[in-house]
Amino acid sequence: MKIIITGSAGFIGFTLARRLLEDNLDIFGIDNHSAYYDVQLKESRVSKLEQYKKYKHFKCDITDMASMLEIFDQIKPDILIHLAAQPGVRYSLQNPQSYVDSNLIGFSNILELSKIYSVKHLIFASSSSVYGGNDAIPFSENDFVDKPLNLYAATKKSNELMSYAYSSLFQIPSTGLRFFTVYGPWGRPDMAPMIILESILSNKRIKIHNNGNHSRDFTFVEDIVDGLIRVLDNPPKVNSISEVYNIGSGIPIQLMDFIEALEKAVGMKAKKEFIGLQPGEMIETYADMGKFNDAFGKIEVTDFNDGIQTFVDWYLNFYKV
């Protein structure tokens, strides 16, 4: 079985690829090594993957259809796991075009490639951000999600709709996964866990939005990967061509509790500055995992404090702090 993972130099893509390589599967990674965040971190991830004989890496942008066709023609994948995207909520306010290019045009290319090469299962990353300002807690796949709070969320909802259309028209088995806030080793420097940890270690003041009245469904990256692997061999049935599922811990954590856990793990106190809610931000996220659990079984969620300690230990070792 040949598997292509786009975004393989990214946080989740790298972690998934490494786990599948440990299972001796043939993995082909595609990533453009975007400078959105530290390219050296991405290259370090790729160098880890290239230690496996069954891994092959392609540096390519998913918006470059000609190059993507060459890669797919060479591999002819059985399964396509699409994790490449322009991430970030706040950055979408500064550089909207990059979201249109990567998340809409790039995803359109992914759908076309899935059609042309008759992939047996397309799995793609959506996001909990599609729930926008939804007041119903926990977030369910049955909730109304047509009022996104930012462009990033709008592109992810668009991906779900585009996938549904292609799946219906061309019988492409596809599964969208709404990831909730992911943390853990090899994490993204632009995300809150890394930003907060770096601020604590450097004794810098942390700007805490909405005066600390936030909660997030923080989900350990290995738990996300467990979910992805369960989905991998279980494409939607013939009469249910395209499906969307939440993947989270199902346990909301207050932001202040998250900061306290990081403080405890490093033995240092954070300097805090409380500010208001920022444009496009969600106050609370919390996954209803019922649909996923019914379809694939319950994920054994990593203990929050254990996950935080594992993340901190990796950070201190990787950055030689």
Residue ranges and their predicted role:
Residues 38, 185, 249:
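Short, conserved catalytic or interaction motifs in soluble domains
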Residues 1-182, 314, 318-321:
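N-terminal Rossmann-like NAD(P)+-binding domain of SDR-like oxidoreductases, especially those catalyzing
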Residues 19, 200-321:
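C-terminal substrate-binding subdomain of Rossmann-fold SDR/epimerase-dehydratase oxidoreductases
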Residues 15, 40-41, 70, 91-94, ...:
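Generic recognition of short, well-ordered alpha-helical segments
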Residues 158, 162, 166, 196, ...:
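Hydrophobic alpha-helix immediately C-terminal to the catalytic Tyr-X-X-X-Lys motif of short-chain
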Residues 133-135, 185-187, 191, 291:
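Short beta-loop-alpha junction of Rossmann-like oxidoreductase domains
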Residues 63, 87, 187, 253-254, ...:
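Short alpha-helical
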